[in-house]
From Swiss-Prot:
GO terms for molecular function: manganese ion binding; metalloaminopeptidase activity; peptidase activity. Binds 2 Zn(2+) ions per subunit. Its EC number is 3.4.11.1, 3.4.11.5. One of its GO terms (biological process) is proteolysis. The gene is lap. The lineage of its organism: Eukaryota, Amoebozoa, Evosea, Eumycetozoa, Dictyostelia. Homohexamer. Keywords: Aminopeptidase, Cytoplasm, Hydrolase, Metal-binding, Protease, Zinc. It catalyses: Release of an N-terminal amino acid, Xaa-|-Yaa-, in which Xaa is preferably Leu, but may be other amino acids including Pro although not Arg or Lys, and Yaa may be Pro. Amino acid amides and methyl esters are also readily hydrolyzed, but rates on arylamides are exceedingly low; Release of N-terminal proline from a peptide. It comes from Dictyostelium discoideum. It is found in: Cytoplasm. GO terms for cellular component: cytoplasm. This is Cytosol aminopeptidase. The active site is at K298, R372. Its main location: cytoplasm. Presumably involved in the processing and regular turnover of intracellular proteins. Catalyzes the removal of unsubstituted N-terminal amino acids from various peptides.
Length: 520
């Protein structure tokens, strides 16, 4: 039974990229009037986008009359579905675009408004069984249009349908065209790949821990990237326990040994700029496939969410998928240490001392502060490539959620130029970052052990900052490095216009944008 569920899950992952198809105008297949839907925009001044204006004129003002009779005022997020607008158009979703001329809008606001408008329209039409959608290309940039459409169509569960068979998703195959066809069709394709990449991260993060062990994680990545690996575009290297011991990664092994599930150390290499792989960017993702807290066990309430504690690893490998699929001229390496954090007779205990790969000793005060342990060894290894930048991504601390909530990820770096780039990429993608302090005083809080060089937990005060200070101990001098604490943005507690309640897959698109910005 378990094997059948896993096989169905692999089939879902393979099909996830094919939810949408880009098709030319008037070339939709198997379409009927009953399954067609149109998405048009309206501004707060009651002005339609061109396709909406055409439909309004063709129906003697029916669209505008309907708007005036409704609560829809053209604000971003508003939507109204009309039926039987013309004999050829069975459904029209009118989506609010806000003010038409707003010179004060930032890049973030403009891009987000497009994603929100498209996402609300797709969800509204999909709920009415429309599967062949025509979107007015004048609503916004083609790239953000594709992102809003693909991301909003994502849904993942194991519920049984009327047939009694378990399904991983209720997603239907939806065909999308833009009207009029944009000159920048490549932008739409790029947005599609960006959204598919994030959706893959969401699949990994949503999958329950019994179906996503470290071994399963590697299998899913191998399946997702099969074409890229087979074609030689991506090299996949899977390290086992003995290699970790040979590398003297005592912190990683100290966490992994508490579980019966074997650890994995996954490396992916993409050489899009040069065959020698020089001047690479390295993404390091925390890969705790389930975090019970270990001997310092977590409270039972909401522990199930800790299936997503490998969100850093999920977004790192998903970014690799996007970068390689886009064929960006950049060299990229992803490193993901994968294991579970479990209590057992073999598990590390509070008070134990571990020796890191760089030779430093660490007193384990709290086994639930395990992410920084596996990341420390992985970061030391990442430095051996002498990359241009190292970015680690981790659901590291509850403290960052308390500080920033679900709307910003915390960014720690001492390199101003790196922060500027990441901040710009976050504004483009809509996955916002907030710079947090990384000063020596926080590191000193991690040096309070009487028996070791470092302690892995310094208490409540400045928790996220102290964790970042701990990680910095494993970065070589003068190495450009940033730590992204994504614990707050790991999941969304409510449905949004284009991101549903659940695991978000953030900041996958930001990582892809960063690689794009650093092409050689």
């Amino acid at each position: 039974m378990l094997k059948n569920i896993i096989n169905k899950k692999n089939l879902f992952i393979n099909n996830q990229q094919n939810i949408f198809q880009i098709i030319k105008r008037n070339k939709m297949t198997d379409s009927t009037v009953d399954n067609k839907g149109y998405i048009v925009g309206i501004y707060e001044n009651e002005e339609f986008t061109p396709l909406g204006q055409q439909l309004n004129e063709k129906t003697n003002g029916h669209l505008l009359k309907s708007i005036k009779l409704s609560d829809t005022k053209g604000k971003v997020g508003d939507n109204l579905v009309l039926y039987n607008v013309t004999p050829e158009v069975s459904r029209v979703a009118i989506v609010g675009l806000g003010k038409k001329e707003n010179n004060n809008s930032t890049t973030y606001e403009k891009n987000e408004n497009t994603r929100k408008a498209i996402g609300s329209g797709v969800k509204a039409l999909k709920s009415k069984n429309a599967t062949h959608l025509t979107i007015d290309s004048n609503i916004g940039d083609a790239k953000q249009t594709a992102e809003g459409a693909f991301l909003s169509n994502f849904k993942f569960d194991f519920k049984t349908g009327t047939s009694g068979k378990t399904a991983n998703s209720t997603n239907e195959s939806i065909q999308v065209q833009l009207s009029p066809s944009p000159s920048s069709e490549e932008c739409f394709k790029e947005g599609k790949i960006l959204a598919e990449s994030q959706n893959f991260a969401r699949v990994l993060m949503e999958t329950p821990a019994n179906l996503l062990t470290p071994t399963n994680f590697v299998q899913h990545v191998s399946s997702q990237m099969k074409e890229l690996i087979d074609s030689g575009k991506v090299e996949m290297i899977v390290r086992e326990e003995q290699w970790v011991k040979d590398q003297k990664m005592g912190m990683f092994w100290g966490v992994a040994k508490g579980s019966d599930e074997p650890l994995k150390f996954l490396e992916l290499h993409y050489r899009g700029a040069s065959a020698d792989g020089k001047d690479s960017i390295v993404y390091v993702g925390k890969g705790i496939t389930f975090d019970s807290g270990g001997i310092s066990i977590k409270p039972s309430a909401n522990m199930g969410l800790m299936k997503g504690d490998m969100g850093g690893a999920a977004t790192a490998v998903s970014a690799m998928f996007g970068v390689a699929s886009l064929g960006l001229k950049v060299n990229l390496i992803t490193i993901t240490p994968l294991c579970e954090n479990m209590p057992s007779g073999k598990a590390t205990k509070p008070g134990d001392i571990l020796t890191a790969a760089n030779g430093k000793t660490v007193e384990v005060d709290n086994t639930d502060a395990e992410g920084r342990l596996i990341l420390g060894d992985a970061l030391h290894y990442a430095c051996s490539f002498k990359p241009t930048h190292i970015i680690d991504i981790a659901t590291l601390t509850g403290a960052i959620d308390v500080a920033l909530g679900q709307h910003y990820a915390g960014c720690f770096t001492t390199t101003d130029s790196l922060w500027d780039q990441l901040n710009e990429c976050g504004n483009i993608s809509g996955e916002r970052l907030w710079r947090m302090p990384l000063i020596p005083e926080y590191r000193k809080q991690m040096e309070t052990s009487k028996v070791a060089d470092l302690i892995n937990s310094a208490g409540r005060s400045g928790g996220a900052c102290c964790a970042a200070g701990f990680l910095k101990e494993f970065i070589t001098a003068d190495q450009s490095w940033s730590h992204l604490d994504i614990a707050g943005v790991m999941s969304s507690s409510e449905d949004g216009p284009y991101i549903r309640k659940g695991m978000t897959g953030k900041p996958t698109r930001t990582l892809i944008e960063f690689a794009k910005k650093n092409q050689q």
